[in-house]
Amino acid sequence: QDGQYFIDPGSEKARNYVINIAKEACELGFDEIQFDYIRYPDSNYKYMVFKDENTYDNRIKNINSFLMVAKKEINSLGCFVSADVFGFILTNKFDGGIGQNLETIIENVDFLSPMVYPSHYSKGSFGYQNPNRNPYGVITSALDDALDRGVEEIKLRPFLQGFWHSDAEVQENIRAAEDKNLDWIIWNVSSSYNLGYFSKLDSWQLK
């Protein structure tokens, strides 16, 4: 719609195309391939035609069969495979119509990066009327849900919010991950990061 397209996650042609590009990147020297938008579209289904019927079981099957094959082929070249997913799947077991399920997807990646951006949580999430203004509590709660569901710390590497937040609020994003002994990535669409985000990092890591 509006000139934008989603590939069908069940299409062998599309899947092989993506895997082949990932393998080329490995051969060029990159040590990790992270799959973004590893999901079904979340709206406007009336415009879409899928190879398989758009059911929960088929969505989960297609996302994970792609990752399973991709991981096998990419790992064989010495590269890690990771994926970023919506933060809500850490807490909810339903896939939200997009084919992301925590227990299955974690088995088919080396690392998982849930996008636990506080601004993306709705009012009342984890008991916060304004989740975006409570980054530490929101992220801690989301990560606790993942760890409680058996995700290993070494595989969990959240995306943190590097936009719409002050330096102090980004620091709270980071502190939430550091307090769980997790690696993390900060996301900003323009790749613009203030040094102030990281001013307290040494003191947290030396605890």
Predicted regions and their residues:
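Substrate-binding cleft of secreted/luminal carbohydrate-active enzymes
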Residues: 109-123, 132-207
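Active-site-proximal loop/short-helix segments
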Residues: 28-58
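Aromatic-lined carbohydrate-recognition surfaces of secreted/lumenal glycan-active proteins
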Residues: 34-35, 59-99, 152-165
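Active-site-adjacent "subsite" loops/lids of carbohydrate-active enzymes
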Residues: 1-24
